[in-house]
């Protein structure tokens, strides 16, 4: 399981980009912290989620994510 925003999620094996799209996030309007490191948007497609990972997704509000 991957902990995303404090909640366990069955997302191992997906890239950050795939997870964001499936969860309905606009990748242009979020910041992602992955195992205590901020990812650049260029890293979203190449970063694969694995069991034990901790991810925080922060939305920039201005109309919602």
Regions found by a protein language model. Name each.
Residues 1-65:
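Ubiquitin-like/PB1-type beta-grasp interaction modules and other compact soluble beta-rich domains
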